[in-house]
């Protein structure tokens, strides 16, 4: 057979700033460039562009584009703030409807992949797969309704029951289910009834050729006044799942150490709340910086002495923070405020590349940050181990795992 045609359904894609959008963009680019696949994406319009620009393009119901050899069917939907349930629901449903129409165009797909942005988009992917008689894959970046149920702003049991029913249907219908780690695999098998023979674990990644250990004193740290500070950094989305209020409370506990600076880089629905919390507490050791362009990521990561990875209690196995892999690639130690039974904890313990703290416990998080602040030898050991671990999660290796799976499914389709 020739090169397989793979179709992805996911709202976030280039030039979206979200981690999932950037990961999907890198995956599609690798499948086209390194493996010769034909790749199409049914995407939405960006809510937040990675370049910080405002999206002013004409928005038809479905617009046809190409980016680095990837075909994009840009499906129109609302772009309200994700901070409210109504706004988020409107974004979900409007994109789902236009994406379902876009999916009617694919009659020759070999593999159709449904993702989880929004959590109902897998249904549109399933319909497209059945119409094209293609193999259907569900790729879980987040598992619903558990993620929504544990975030107090989005507790709606009627909606959550519908999401649970939808996900069980998608899992039963899928030829393969992709989980981001062993804990997520267990959640899908034992919690959702997935056939263990159909579940494949493929990790997220960082590109170790783009993000690598570098000197702390660089143009970014000098420009931001961070070169002579002990920088404790959170980089990426400031969303509902991380419990970042705990990080601000940690900043209050280390404020007497004048050279420690807590730095948030990125954006998200929780950023205004965190900024307000910092102002109300009168903290001078916390800074907020915007998303950095991809070409500046390596220097922004190198500016950190220590990173923080956090996840609210109860979300282990339902979300895997993708920022971990970039931290590993940068060769920096981190404190992971996560539950013990999760992918981040497993990687931390297996590779000895960070410290673990109790989730949503600012005192324990502060203790672990200070342990690294006071012990440069420990920091260096964890940093070296982090970079070694990153090579296992390098982008070409993980993209190759996706290609092998898609090729296997495409060949099986051609034989039927």
Which residues does each predicted region cover?
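A short, well-ordered alpha-helix in the C-terminal region of glycosyltransferases
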Residues: 364, 371, 378-392
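Acidic anion/phosphate-binding donor-loop and adjacent secondary structure
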Residues: 189-190, 197-200, 206-222, 243
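Conserved donor-binding/catalytic core segment of Leloir-type glycosyltransferases
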Residues: 225-242, 248-251, 263
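Carbohydrate-associated surface elements
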Residues: 45, 183, 205
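Nucleotide-sugar-dependent
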Residues: 242, 293-328, 333-346
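N-terminal subdomain of nucleotide-sugar transferases
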Residues: 1-65
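Membrane-proximal helix-turn-helix segments that form the acceptor-binding/catalytic region
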Residues: 123, 127-131, 157-179
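Nucleotide-activated donor-binding/catalytic signature segment of Leloir-type glycosyltransferases, i.e.
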Residues: 258, 265-266, 271-298
């Amino acid at each position: 057979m020739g090169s397989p045609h793979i179709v992805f359904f996911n709202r976030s894609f280039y030039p979206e700033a979200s981690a999932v959008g950037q990961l999907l963009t890198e995956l599609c680019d690798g499948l086209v460039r390194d493996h010769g696949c034909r790749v199409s994406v049914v995407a939405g319009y960006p809510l937040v562009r990675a370049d910080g620009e405002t999206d002013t393009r004409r928005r038809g119901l479905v617009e046809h584009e190409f980016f680095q050899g990837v075909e994009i069917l840009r499906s129109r939907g609302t772009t309200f703030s994700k901070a409210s349930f109504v706004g988020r629901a409107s974004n979900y449903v409007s994109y789902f409807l236009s994406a379902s129409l876009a999916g009617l165009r694919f009659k020759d797909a070999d593999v159709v992949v449904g993702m989880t942005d929004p959590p109902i988009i897998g249904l549109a992917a399933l319909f497209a797969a059945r119409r094209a008689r293609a193999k259907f894959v569900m790729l879980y970046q987040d598992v619903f309704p558990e993620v929504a149920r544990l975030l107090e702003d989005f507790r709606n049991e009627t909606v959550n029951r519908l999401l649970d029913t939808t996900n069980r249907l998608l899992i039963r219908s899928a030829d393969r289910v992709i989980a981001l780690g062993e804990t997520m695999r267990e959640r899908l098998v034992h919690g959702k009834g997935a056939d263990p023979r159909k579940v494949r674990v493929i990790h997220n990644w960082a590109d170790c050729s783009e993000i690598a250990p570098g000197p702390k004193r660089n143009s970014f740290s000098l420009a931001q006044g961070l070169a002579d500070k002990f920088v404790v950094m959170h980089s990426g989305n400031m969303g509902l799942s991380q419990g970042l209020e705990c990080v601000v409370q940690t900043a209050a506990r280390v404020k007497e150490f004048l050279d420690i600076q807590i730095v948030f880089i990125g954006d998200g629905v929780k950023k205004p709340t965190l900024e307000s919390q910092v102002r109300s507490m009168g903290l001078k050791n916390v800074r907020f910086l915007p998303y950095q362009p991809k070409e500046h990521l390596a220097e922004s990561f190198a500016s950190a002495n220590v990173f923080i990875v956090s996840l609210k209690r109860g979300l282990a196995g339902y979300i895997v923070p993708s920022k971990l892999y970039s931290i590993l690639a940068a060769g920096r130690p981190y404190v992971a405020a996560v539950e013990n039974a999760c992918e981040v904890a497993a990687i931390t313990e297996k590779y000895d590349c960070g410290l673990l703290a109790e989730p949503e416990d600012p005192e324990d998080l502060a203790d672990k940050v200070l342990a690294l602040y006071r012990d440069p030898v420990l920091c260096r050991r964890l940093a070296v181990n982090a970079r070694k671990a990153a090579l296992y999660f390098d982008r070409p290796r993980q993209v190759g795992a996706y290609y092998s799976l898609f090729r296997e499914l495409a060949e099986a389709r051609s034989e039927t």
